[in-house]
Curated annotation (Swiss-Prot):
It comes from Mus musculus (Mouse). Keywords: Carboxypeptidase, Hydrolase, Protease. One of its GO terms (molecular function) is carboxypeptidase activity. It holds the Pfam family Peptidase_M20. Its EC number is 3.4.13.4. Catalyzes the peptide bond hydrolysis in dipeptides having basic amino acids lysine, ornithine or arginine at C-terminus. Postulated to function in a metabolite repair mechanism by eliminating alternate dipeptide by-products formed during carnosine synthesis. GO terms for biological process: proteolysis; regulation of protein metabolic process. Belongs to the peptidase M20A family. This is Xaa-Arg dipeptidase. InterPro entries: Amidohydrolase (IPR017439), Bact_exopeptidase_dim_dom (IPR036264), Peptidase_M20 (IPR002933), Peptidase_M20/M20A_hydrolases (IPR052030), Peptidase_M20_dimer (IPR011650), Xaa-Arg_dipeptidase (IPR017144).
Length: 431
């Protein structure tokens, strides 16, 4: 994956006072649409769908843009690259938008978790993306001669499993985008968190069934291999870096106690701060899996998922602009020390951050409940979350306006993106 082709960093200019008026108009438009936006979020929340199966959410989101007045003002492409992805685009008719137009994109997620529903608040991610796009459009519409800009919303399914954004990158959906924005619900406000790289595997052991009481010596125990593998990885933790994470389950351990299991299956996730470190960790783990097969006489298949999630490359220039706008709206952000020493996860936005500069902040939704719990599911569907969600959308829209009307900021965003991408490439190719 390579970076996008850039256009000149001069889409528009505006005085500080004029820019503040545009930001105010963006916030006003989001408030005006609050009821519709909340209804959209609740519709997605009330009918949770798993990765690549978000058909109802896809329909709700595309209909929202198709029905946004005036009629047909958004160019909507359903099933964009994936059955449950979409693209909505708007450009000021007076701006002579063309190939040189600055393309600003807001990303929506809307897949849920098995059994828990929207325990990661992806309904709120979708709402933030839609709301920010509406706010930015309203601000640009208030200008007599708006600059050449395209406002794009990308519906990106399957973040929880599979990596829909990676599919869309491969399909060309991120080509020619200049800056991308999205925001993720959490327990605090942070312009970024150190999201790490992730590699997932399914490990299958094949043995030989036998009667466990009458002639166990005739069997080859695949469950023993799974247990040994689990133990091997537990011992490996002594030599793991503090920033590495390994977690897994035994998905299949046999069918009946008096039958020597002929098959077992584990699923493991490996995480590390960089793709380079992730490769080292993965090699160590695979050695553990193969050693368990050797010790038990089983055969083993190690199947990697189709996509690895890259670590997120933060753009501090963009983060600073977002933080400034957020503080004006009353957001309180955690400290840099808390960011660096706090919890982290993985996201397919990491892969996006290697292709186009962007921002992936986290936002408080009025609860201390942790993501991926029943309590967070409840909070993500609550009315209390709406204030914080729409406030975040306003901050994103305001930051997008900064990018559009401050050429020096856009140039800084691009320069930092290039430098950090080169650093990552050097890190990942170093011996």
């Amino acid at each position: 994956m390579g970076p996008v082709v850039e256009r000149p960093a001069e889409p528009g200019t505006s005085s500080a006072a004029e820019l503040e008026l545009l930001k105010r108009r963006a916030a006003e438009r989001i408030d005006e649409a609050a009821e519709r936006l909340g209804a959209l979020s609740r519709a997605i929340w009330s009918a949770p769908e798993l990765a690549y199966e978000e058909h109802r959410a896809h329909g709700e989101l595309t209909r929202f843009f198709e029905c946004e007045p005036p009629a047909a003002s958004w160019a909507v492409q359903p099933h964009f690259g994936l059955p449950t992805a979409f693209r909505a685009e708007w450009a000021p008719p007076e701006s002579a938008a063309g190939p040189r137009a600055l393309q600003v994109a807001f990303l929506c997620e809307y897949d849920a978790l098995p059994a828990l529903g929207h325990a990661c608040g992806h309904n709120l991610i979708a709402e933030v993306g839609v709301a920010a796009a509406l706010g930015l459009r309203a601000a640009l519409e208030s200008i007599a001669a708006p600059p050449p800009v395209k406002v794009i919303v990308l519906g990106t399914p399957a973040e929880e499993d599979g990596g829909g954004k990676i599919d869309l990158i491969e399909a060309g959906a991120f080509e020619n985008l200049d800056v991308v924005f999205m925001a993720h619900p959490s327990q605090e406000n942070a312009a970024y968190l150190p999201d790490v790289a992730e590699h997932d595997v399914t490990v299958k052991y094949y043995g030989k069934a036998s009667h466990a009481a009458a002639y166990p010596w005739e069997g080859v125990n695949a469950l023993d291999a799974a247990v040994l593998a689990y133990t091997n990885l537990s011992v490996l933790r002594q030599q793991m870096k503090p920033t590495w994470r390994v977690h897994g389950i035994i998905k299949n351990g046999g069918v009946k106690p008096n039958i020597i299991p002929s098959y077992s299956e584990l699923v493991y996730y490996f995480r590390a701060p960089s793709m380079k470190e992730l490769q080292v960790l993965t090699k160590k783990a695979e050695d553990c899996f193969r050693a368990a097969a050797l010790a038990t006489g089983c055969t083993v298949d190690i199947e990697s998922e189709a996509h690895d999630y890259y670590n997120v490359i933060p753009n501090k220039t963009l983060c600073s602009a977002y933080t400034e706008n957020g503080k004006k709206l009353g957001m309180e952000f955690i400290s840099e020390d808390a960011v660096l020493n706090g919890p982290s996860g993985s996201t397919d936005f990491g892969n996006v951050s290697f292709v186009v500069p962007g921002i992936h902040p986290y936002f408080y939704i009025g609860t201390d409940a942790l993501n991926h719990t029943e309590q967070y599911t409840e909070a993500a569907g609550s009315q209390a979350a709406q204030l914080y969600t729409l406030r975040t959308a306003k901050a994103l829209a305001m930051t997008a306006l900064d990018v559009i009307f401050k050429p020096a900021l856009l140039e800084g965003v691009r320069k930092e993106f290039k430098c950090k991408l080169q650093e990552e490439q050097l890190l990942n190719t170093a011996a």
